[in-house]
From Swiss-Prot:
Gene name per UniProt: Nup210
Family in the record: Belongs to the NUP210 family.
Positions of modified residues (Phosphothreonine): 1844
Natural source organism: Mus musculus
Residues covered by the BIG2 domain: 1078-1151
Lineage: Eukaryota, Metazoa, Chordata, Craniata, Vertebrata
Keyword Thylakoid: no
Name of the molecule in the record: Nuclear pore membrane glycoprotein 210
């Protein structure tokens, strides 16, 4: 409590926030610290936070301080030292806070300072062994409560070794124990211990070690004086020798085996063996426990003391104990012991070293150990006297050595493979050499896998350094081992390796050793080295640099670098395939570099691949740049075309003496660097039979050709060989050489052939006539055939050249065909299609257009000698045996095929016929494609049958085999699968009627298939539902369409889809076509009865949904007119019918079709009489009923005449006013309808009696013919009896009843529902059938009968009282219904409205009454509501059956009819007139700039006006409170007037752009000169004279002023003529305004203060001011009409003042001004001595009057200077100007008289006169100033129109007030109203 009271409350609040806050991630190392109280030393404790940087503080620094650890520059630290600071011995606490400077998190630790009450020494053991590690002893301090202090750091202790009085015979010596310092040990102490040891002090922790065996006692006490009474702490330690027993573990022996034990001790870090038996120690066997089956009398084992050997005698166990021989030591220390188990051998085990894995490697040495285990898997000690026989296969192992007992073998693995080693424990040999064979030998074997050593390939890899990790990967191959390896890298910064041996380079250079360890034996591994170095050079390795076009060249790269370590050894990189090599080709298009790089190879590390694209040569440059390393290499490449024999391709045949020019193409080109190495060789077998010669160099650079001319000199065959290439060179070490061979044959012709030249030589077909009639060929009789002569040798090979032959031609019938001499045979070499040219002899045969047969023959008679001589043919040669050929020609017409184009369906069963006519009759038919169609020709019929195979287009070509020249006759066949189906059907069908659906199947070209294919397609038309039925019709619209009849059987919507089966059996369906089966389209009403001028709207029911537009028409347009919306208006008496048609558009044809139609009869009549429709004629007082006017028939309802134009008026009256009240139908909501709407009224029964109800119907325009006989009025009257309601007078109570209609129900409710237990019961006699029924919940249900029942309601109160009421329940039929409306409308002055407000939503409630007028509480009527038109109101169902909601949407009259569906006699009619509730009525268009004072009489119940709003404030802004609206922009807007929670009405306003803006000068009577300085111009925006619309209230006028409508316009000024050098705005100012009284905008123009220069200029020239106004600049097309404002700048004088004297008695002054001002200019003088008279008048331009000013009395001024003024004023313009006049009297020195000398000479000669004149001028000026301030200043006007022009202070003498008051104002009688304009006050020049 004491320390808590010291903490500030604010701090506690902070702590509380931090403690209860969310846990932070940072933590302190300790929550509480207990520190000892000290005086001499300070005990520290380090606090440390896990993370963050903190500001540390202590709540009580005097108890415990806190010091942060770290740099002094930082304001925070993560560690801090807590130090006990308490000066008085007490237990106190300080709270340590650490606040994170970043997050604000606060950590807390409590630091407690207390006294030490006791200490104790803590150790890990109390026994020390000689030469063992030292023991650490630590002091632990406790307070009075036994709490342990957190630290004793820094507290000084005294550690001493004292005498041990309890040694019990042990040697007690200070030398037995030694206290060590940490400085001389190998252990790290706490930092404060090191500091204390340096100061030769001992802390709370020390080290001790044993010096010799014995016992020692250690004592520690606190050195601090405060704790002198604290009891020291003591500890006794025992120091022993370190004795070991070998083996020290438990031993398992077999019977008969033995083990030798050794006793050892550790001395100076070495283990030495003690000779046993010893003086100090002895071995003993104790606790011998034989096996249960053993002999208890025999020992389990015996110990031979001399040899320390234990021999197992029988199965069991025994303990071997090492003990002290000295009795005093036997209980003081614990010596080692061992347990010996004698067991039976269970099985053998095998181990191998190294690795302990039975996976070995050949060539390695291994130690195999065979171990014996008992049945419990305990390892048996392998005694030397056991015998184990091991079998190690000699082909796998080389045994180097073995142990005597056979348990150890040193071997070498010599062969790989799988084998097994086995071992058998057979016997035990005793000490005497006796062999004891085991009855059951123990045998086992071990499988061994031996592998060859692991080697990695390659052994060295060298990679270039790349900046990114993983640039190179290489899969290292490992051989040997088990095949399953684990991989490792010695330096992962250089290279890494994956589990699959994939090496990846890292980011550093250097060496990494990759090892692959055998997973089955990790000791086996193979390794290789990976170097990562920087490259230093790059070059291409020798390779092939020539390639055929299309082939690829691989260009290997060799990149070298220096080995790591700084040496000069260069090594070739193993892999540089990931180098970012830049490959550049000098000549683009020859070689194309291929993506990717060559994989590394033995002689290269990477490389590029290029593809030969075109023949030519280029240079390839490969470069690499990274950082400071830049390498490049260049190589020249060449591409060539393959060498091939073109002509001939293989064999050339010529006749003797003929030659053949052989053409070869391609082959290597001359090497670009050494062209001289290029060669071409051509050889033959026998150079004497043929001559060969190369024709010129290669033809061109781009297309290399080799031509060899071969000439036949002797008959025979030869092989010609050509080889092309380059010889090896330095830049082309592996050149390409291309060889090729052809055969040459020189032979005589064995036969000749004659063939017609056909237009299609690709058809290798012969005419059948040629085979049947031997060389009979039909040809066209209209074209000359061309015959081709060919020569063949004995092998049937055609001659390449037979030009050395001599040929003779003949014709058998020259009249049909002849050989003309002027058309000799042309020898032409033509390509035979294989590139080889053959000689053709082309001979033209002339035909003469006659049919018949002729024979043409050609004969080779011998050789031409000229050819033989030129070819140097060897002589003699064999003569030629003549050969000949003939051909018979038949002249015929050309072939034709029909049809030429058609489309067929792809189906196996489809076939079409092509008709072939004319021609030779021998035809070959083929197609342009092989897989589209199959064509079969029936020659007997001349018909080709076409079968489809696959979709597509193909051309059938009919070749006439026996006509040589004509092109084939063609027919284009399109084979198509089904692309889509198209269903055309009207989407609407009336139930019970039918429409036709048309289906077409389209091919791929969107063309329809023929209908004959539909049978192959299984065409079906299906409907998605059963609302329609489908019938297939046989009639066909065309050859492509299937027709179906769609019959509507049920109402709904479905879809039609056609489907067919294609060739593959898949169904193909069309897009579903929606079709609607709609109910019969019916127009309502079925008959329309109207009078002339009345209107009724025809509506519809049924028909398609959503309903399309209905087209209305009438058959007799003179009787009535019908609008597009179905509104029928009566025109004249008569009958007609209105047809309503529902149309739809045919999707395919686009034609409009009629879906459904209906007729309505229309009767236009005259009202012959009227009747009052009253549901009852007897009514009870206090009830009401509706009455309305009808015609004489039931069809003549108010719908027939209620809205006629011109209208009818209805006037109601009663004969006795006190019996009935007549009220309008909407009287309850304060609407009083005018007479023209009062066709229906409400009748209220007031008092009992009988009265007549009369109505008079008057025609507003009798000539309209609405009443029979052009009558003016009709009337009717009925009698109504009002009777009094039955009441009880004694007692005077109200007897009420529940009124229900038959078959209705009501839920009864009482005021005790939920509070009392209610029960309901109908009290009727047992003989009377109940009229109503009720249940326990209060549901009252009436039956079909009528009558009265009694209902008992009992309430059982919880306090024990019962309440009972009896209620009569009357069941009666409904007699009539009545409509009422809500809500009630309130107006400002309680006046009634004449119509419903536009935009209002009202609720109509239907009330049901019985025959007495009482209202039913429950009924079962189903009501219908209808209006005579739907464009003025919107009607909708209400929340209950007897309500409807109507919203008024447009101005006009609508009639509402409500009736009971089951009882048509229950009906009512009410008028619904709708008018605007917002005024004013806007006759014309509203334009931008108009201001509207909107108003509405509607208010809330309390008389509060509503709020105004606009749908678009940027178009029309409306003040929400007053309703003032300003049109700002063109557009349509809706203004809303809303009374919150009651109603909302609106008015639609269209704001247009004004066509013109007119400014007019405002003529006003100005009464003062000051007002003449301003002028106002009215601005009319638009065509109206006023821009203020509506009647504005005072509040609205204030709102207009606050809204500043003048901001909408801007006013502009300019001079009408540009006659001044300054603009009008420098002289005048103009401001826009708005005058609410005028309702117009204004431009107020004011003249500024003018400078003398401006005043002078304005007077010198005359013009007027043009004022225009404009609205925002977006309306650029607005016409602007300006106003012309005349202005007068004011009077101007050419002198500022006048000086007169007795010498100069007169002076002239010119006064300038407007003509209006100068015409009646008056002048007045302030002194009689000074006069002014007109000298000259000039009313030209400029206008001025010259005045002569003189002194009347020459002696004036003799008594002193006379100062006065002349005032020039104009009554017409109220302008005036004042000129000061000074008269001085000057004496003449030279003469006695005053008139002797001139004024000037006296002035110049008299010094006094100069001073006099100066002071006179000063006096005059002073008088003027005083007069100004005295007279003018108080008279300044403040009217806004009197904006006086400003002037600078030096012009002040020229203001109006500068003249005396007497001249300042004209007499009122003389003041004339100046013309409206701008007038300046008086100005004068200086």
């Amino acid at each position: 409590m004491a320390r808590a009271s010291l903490v500030q409350p604010a701090l506690w609040a902070l702590l509380l926030l931090q403690v209860v806050g969310p846990a932070a991630a940072a933590k302190l190392n300790i929550p509480k610290v207990l520190l000892p109280f000290t005086r001499a030393t300070r005990v520290n404790f380090t606090l440390e936070a896990s993370e963050g940087c903190y500001r540390w503080s202590s709540t009580r620094p005097e108890v415990a301080s806190i010091e942060p650890l770290g740099s002094s520059e930082q304001q925070c630290s993560q560690k801090a030292v807590v130090q006990a600071r308490l000066t008085q011995p007490a237990r106190l606490t300080s709270i340590i806070f650490a606040e994170d400077i970043t997050t604000g998190q606060v950590l807390r630790c409590d630091a407690i300072v207390d006294l030490i009450h006791g200490i104790q020494i803590v150790s890990t053991t109390r026994e020390l062994y000689l030469e063992d590690s030292p023991l650490e002893l630590k002091i632990q301090a406790l307070d009075s409560e036994g709490n342990t202090f957190s630290t004793l750091a820094g507290l000084v202790f005294d550690w001493t070794i004292v005498k041990d009085t309890e040694a019990n015979g042990f040697s007690d010596s200070h030398n037995a124990l030694r206290i060590l310092t940490f400085l001389e040990s190998t252990y790290i102490p706490p930092s404060y211990i090191s500091e204390m040891e340096k100061a030769a002090k001992q802390g709370d922790t020390i080290l001790v070690s044993g010096m010799k065996t014995g016992s020692s006692k250690l004592k520690a006490r606190i050195q601090e004086a405060v704790y002198k009474n604290v009891r020291p702490a003591e500890v006794r330690l025992l120091i022993l020798e370190n004795i070991l027993l070998n083996p020290a573990y438990d031993v398992y022996l077999l019977v008969g085996t033995s083990i030798h034990y050794k006793v050892q001790k550790i001395r100076q870090g070495k283990i030495t063996e003690l000779s046993m038996p010893s003086d100090q120690y002895e071995l003993q066997l104790q606790n011998s426990i034989p096996d249960p089956q053993g002999d208890p009398a025999r020992p389990v084992a015996i110990l031979t003391q001399d040899t320390s050997r234990v021999t197992a005698m029988q199965m069991g166990q025994s303990n071997l104990v090492l003990g002290h021989r000295s009795i005093r030591m036997q209980g003081a220390s614990r010596l080692p012991n061992s347990t010996i188990y004698v067991v039976e051998a269970g099985y053998l085990g095998f181990t191998v070293y190294p690795g302990d894995r039975w996976v070995l490697e050949t060539g390695h040495l291994y130690a195999i150990t065979i171990e014996v285990f008992d049945r419990s898997s305990n390892k048996v000690y392998p005694s030397d006297n056991i015998r184990i026989e091991a079998v190690l296969p000699a082909e796998f192992f080389e045994v180097l050595s073995s142990s005597q007992n056979g348990s150890y073998h040193h071997i070498r693995a010599i062969q790989s493979g799988q084998t097994a080693i086995s071992a058998t424990l057979t016997s035990v040999v005793d000490q005497d050499g006796g062999v004891h064979v085991l009855q059951v030998p123990v045998w086992n074997q071990q499988e061994v896998d031996i592998h060859i050593p692991i080697t990695l390939y390659p052994s060295i890899l060298t990679f270039p350094w790349q900046p990114k990790t993983g640039a190179y990967q290489y899969t290292i191959k490992a051989h040997g081992g088990s095949g399953n390896f684990s991989w490792s890298s010695s330096s992962s910064m250089v290279a890494t390796v994956t589990v699959k041996g994939v090496m990846t380079t890292s980011g550093d250079t250097g060496l990494s050793v990759i090892r692959a360890h055998d997973v089955q034996n990790p000791l086996h591994f193979g390794e290789m080295k990976v170097y990562v170095i920087e490259p230093s050079s790059m070059e291409f390795a020798p390779c092939q640099v020539e390639a055929r076009v299309g082939h690829t060249l691989e260009l290997p790269l060799t990149i070298s670098g220096f080995m790591p370590g700084g040496g000069s050894e260069v090594v070739t990189l193993s892999d540089c395939s990931h180098f970012d090599l830049v490959v550049e080709v000098e000549n683009q298009g020859v070689f194309q570099p291929l993506p990717g790089r060559l994989p590394p190879g033995p002689e290269h590390c990477s490389g590029v691949k290029v593809k030969a694209d075109a023949q030519g040569s280029t240079t390839l440059l490969v470069s690499y740049t990274h950082g400071h390393v830049h390498l490049d290499a260049k190589i020249t490449l060449a591409a060539y075309l393959p060498l091939k024999a073109v002509d001939p391709s293989s064999v050339a045949v010529v006749t003797l003496g003929s030659s053949k020019e052989m053409l070869f193409e391609g082959g290597p080109r001359p090497w670009v660097l050494e062209p001289s190495k290029f060669f071409r060789n051509v050889t033959s077998e026998d150079t004497g039979s043929i001559s060969l010669s190369l024709l010129g160099p290669p033809a061109s650079r781009n297309y290399q050709q080799h031509r060899v001319l071969m000439t036949c000199q002797a008959l025979g065959e030869q092989v010609i060989a050509l080889s092309v290439g380059n010889r090896p060179s330095l830049s082309n070490p592996f050149p390409a050489v291309e060889p090729t061979v052809v055969k040459s044959i020189c032979a005589p012709p064995s036969r000749l052939t004659l063939m017609p030249v056909y237009a299609l030589p690709q058809l290798d077909l012969s005419c059948p006539l040629l085979q049947q009639n031997k060389q009979v060929v039909p040809v066209s009789s209209h074209r000359n055939p061309l015959l081709d002569l060919g020569a063949y040798d004995q092998q049937g090979r055609r001659f390449d050249n037979f030009s050395s032959l001599s040929i003779q031609w003949e014709s058998s019938r020259p009249l049909l065909a002849s050989i003309e001499l002027d058309q000799p045979m042309q020898l032409v070499s033509q390509d035979d299609g294989n590139g080889q040219k053959k000689l053709h002899g082309l001979q033209t045969v002339s035909v003469h257009e006659a049919s018949g047969t002729t024979a043409i023959s050609a004969t080779a008679t011998g050789y031409q000698q000229s050819h033989l001589s030129e070819a140097r043919v060897k002589q003699p040669h064999d003569p030629l045996v003549p050969v000949s050929a003939s051909i018979e020609l038949i002249l015929v017409e050309d072939v034709r095929v029909s049809p030429e184009e058609m489309t067929i369906y792809n189906h196996p069963g489809v076939q079409v016929e092509l008709y072939i006519t004319e021609g030779s009759g021998y035809f070959f038919l083929n197609t342009s494609t092989q897989d589209i169609i199959k064509v079969a020709y029936q020659d007997t019929r001349g018909v080709a049958l076409v079968h489809p195979l696959l979709p597509g287009s193909s051309t059938v070509m009919v070749h006439d085999l026996c006509l040589a020249f004509p092109a084939p006759a063609k027919a284009i066949i399109h084979v198509s699968d089904i692309q889509e189906l198209y269903v055309r059907v009207v989407d609407k069908v009336e139930i019970g009627k039918a429409v036709k659906a048309y289906v077409r199947v389209l091919d791929f070209y969107k063309k329809p298939f023929l209908a004959k294919y539909f049978t192959f397609m299984d065409l079906k038309l299906q409907a998605a539902s059963q609302i329609i039925t489908l019938v297939t019709l046989d009639e066909a619209l065309d050859n492509y369409t299937a027709t179906f009849l769609v019959h509507g059987v049920a109402i709904g919507q479905t879809s039609l889809s056609a489907s067919v089966t294609d060739k593959s059996g898949q169904r193909v369906s069309s897009t579903p076509q929606q079709i609607e089966v709609f109910p019969p389209f019916r127009l309502i009403p079925r008959k329309v009865t109207l009078i002339i001028g009345a209107m009724m709207q025809i509506t519809s029911e049924g028909g398609p949904q959503p309903q399309s537009n209905i087209l209305f028409s009438i058959n007799n347009e003179s009787v009535a007119a019908v609008s597009s919306s179905g509104l029928v208006r009566g025109l004249m008496v008569g009958n007609g019918s209105v047809l309503g048609v529902v149309q739809a558009v045919d999707a395919e044809t686009g034609k409009v079709i009629i879906v459904s139609q209906d007729l309505v009869e229309v009767e236009v009549l005259q009202l012959q009489a009227v009747r009052i429709r009253a549901p009852i004629t007897r009514m009870r007082t206090g009830t009401q009923m509706p009455v309305f006017v009808t015609g004489i028939t039931s069809n003549q309802s108010p719908f027939s005449f209620g809205n006629a134009v011109p209208g009818l008026t209805f006037h109601w009256s009663v004969t006795k006013r006190d019996v009935l009240d007549l009220r309008g139908r909407h009287h309850e909501v304060s609407i009083r309808l005018p007479p023209q709407y009062n066709f229906a009224m409400n009748v209220y029964g007031r008092v009992k009696g009988r009265t007549g109800l009369r109505v008079v119907v008057k025609a507003l325009d009798p000539t309209a013919g609405q009443l029979h006989g052009l009558g003016k009025e009709l009337s009717d009257e009925i009698q109504i009896q009002v009777f009094e309601k039955l009441r009880l007078l004694n007692p005077e109570i109200e007897a009420e009843q529940i009124l229900m209609s038959p078959n209705s129900f009501i839920k009864l409710q009482t005021n005790r529902d939920g509070a009392a237990i209610l029960s309901y019961r109908v009290l009727d006699g047992p003989e009377k059938a109940p009229i109503v029924h009720t249940d326990e919940k209060g549901f009252l249900v009436s039956g079909s009968g009528i009558g009265v029942s009694t209902l008992e309601v009992i309430a059982q109160e919880p306090f024990g009282t019962n309440q009972t009421i009896l209620v009569a329940v009357k069941v009666s039929p409904v007699s009539y219904l009545r409509i009422s409306m809500s809500p009630v409308l309130h107006t400002q002055h309680k006046e009634a409205l004449t119509a419903l407000p536009l935009g209002m939503t009202v609720t109509f409630i239907v009330h049901f009454h019985d025959s007495s007028g009482d209202i039913f509480h429950a009924h079962n009527s189903v009501l219908n509501f209808a209006t005579n038109r739907d464009d003025f109101v919107q009607i909708g169902k209400g929340a209950t059956n007897n309500t409807c909601i109507i919203r008024t949407v447009s101005v006009g009259l609508t009639l509402l009819h409500v009736w009971d569906v089951e009882h048509l006699g229950l009906s009512d009619f009410v008028p619904l007139p709708v008018l605007q509730a917002i005024t004013p009525e806007l006759s014309g268009a509203v334009v931008v700039g108009d201001i509207l004072c909107l108003a509405s009489v509607l208010t809330s119940l309390g008389g509060v006006s509503g709020t105004w709003s606009s749908s678009a404030s940027h178009v029309l802004y409306v003040d929400p409170k007053t309703g003032v609206a300003i049109a700002r922009d063109a557009g349509s807007v809706t203004v809303y007037y809303e009374i919150a929670g009651q109603l909302k009405t609106f008015k639609e306003i269209v704001v247009g752009t004004p066509q013109k803006i007119v400014a007019r000068r405002l003529h006003s009577a100005q009464t003062s000169i000051q007002e003449a300085t301003a002028s106002k111009v009215t601005v009319s925006v638009g065509d109206r004279s006023s821009n203020l619309l509506g009647e504005c209230s005072p509040a609205q006028r204030e709102a207009i002023e606050a809204l500043h409508p003048e901001s909408l316009i801007s006013c502009q000024l300019q001079f009408k003529q540009d006659v001044f050098d300054f603009p009008a705005c420098d002289v005048f100012t103009v401001e826009p305004g708005f005058d609410a009284a005028l309702g117009q905008y204004l431009c107020s123009v004011t003249m500024r203060r003018l400078t003398d220069k401006q005043l002078k200029h304005l007077n010198m020239k005359k013009t007027s001011l043009a004022v225009t106004a404009s609205i925002p600049s977006s309306y650029t097309s607005v016409e602007k009409v300006g106003a012309e404002v005349p202005f007068s700048p004011g009077l101007y004088a050419n002198q500022a003042e006048i000086l007169l004297s007795n010498h100069y008695t007169s002076s002239e002054v010119k006064v300038f001004g407007a003509v209006e001002s100068l015409e009646n200019l008056e002048v007045k003088s302030g002194s009689p001595a000074v006069l002014a008279f007109v000298k000259e008048k000039s009313f030209g331009l400029p206008s001025f009057i010259t005045y002569t000013v003189g002194v009347l009395d020459p002696t004036a001024g003799s008594q002193g200077p006379l100062s006065t003024a002349l005032t020039f004023s104009s009554p017409a313009t109220n302008q005036a100007i004042t000129i000061p006049v000074t008269v001085a009297f000057v004496l003449d020195r030279r003469g006695p008289g005053p008139y002797g000398a001139s004024l000037l000479s006296h002035f110049l000669d008299s010094y006094q006169v100069m001073f006099f004149t100066f002071f006179a001028l000063l006096a005059g000026t002073a008088v003027t100033i005083i007069a100004y301030h005295t007279v003018c200043a108080p008279r300044e006007l403040a009217s806004p129109l009197a904006l006086t022009p400003r002037a600078s202070p030096q012009h002040s003498p020229h203001y109006l007030a500068s003249s005396p008051a007497a001249f300042n104002t004209l007499p009122s009688g003389r003041k004339a109203s100046p013309p409206s304009g701008l007038w300046s006050p008086a100005y004068a020049s200086h």
